[in-house]
């Protein structure tokens, strides 16, 4: 739990009045919202998160963040320039900057990413370094969070890094 103004530090204009709550979690999935969550309304290829803001509030959201002009006049809906960037900053703030506490290695390319990351993990494990591999083969070693995608979304990724 963290105070809402600390989660949204550097994201919002200081003149915005926020509810006085402790944030329990962050998500862009209205079905995952629980009491005290902040809901981020991502617009996707097939769905628009703005259509689910009402559901998020019914499930307990304390605030919704959007980059849509249509909804900013609603109570506890805040407009930002880019909701995806705001989500990344909020995740970093909420989880106390876990990306600064670990070494991250990204592997890109058409072929060989899983093989390369598996070999690299083996080398690092052999030198007694703590490792975490995230990719098409899942998350190694296993963690309690089960992302629904090959690459975890920003919310799952920060929870995993935490």
For the regions a language model picked out, list residue spans one by one.
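N-terminal leader/targeting and accessory segments in enzymes
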Residues: 1-89, 93
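Phosphate-binding loop of NTP-binding sites
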Residues: 8, 86-162
């Amino acid at each position: 739990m963290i105070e809402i103004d600390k989660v949204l530090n550097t994201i919002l204009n200081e003149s915005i009045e926020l509810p006085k709550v402790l944030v329990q979690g962050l998500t862009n999935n209205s079905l995952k919202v629980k009491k005290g969550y902040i809901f981020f309304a991502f617009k996707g290829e097939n769905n628009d998160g703005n259509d689910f803001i009402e559901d998020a509030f019914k499930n307990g959201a304390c605030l919704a963040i959007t980059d849509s002009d249509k909804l900013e006049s609603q109570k506890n809906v805040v407009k930002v320039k880019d909701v995806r960037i705001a989500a990344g900053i909020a995740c970093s703030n909420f989880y106390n900057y876990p990306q600064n506490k670990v070494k991250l290695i990204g592997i890109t390319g058409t072929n060989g990413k899983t093989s390369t990351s598996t070999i690299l993990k083996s080398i690092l494990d052999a030198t007694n370094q703590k490792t975490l591999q995230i990719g098409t083969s899942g998350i190694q070693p296993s963690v309690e969070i089960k992302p629904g995608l090959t690459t975890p979304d920003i919310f799952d990724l920060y929870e995993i890094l935490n």
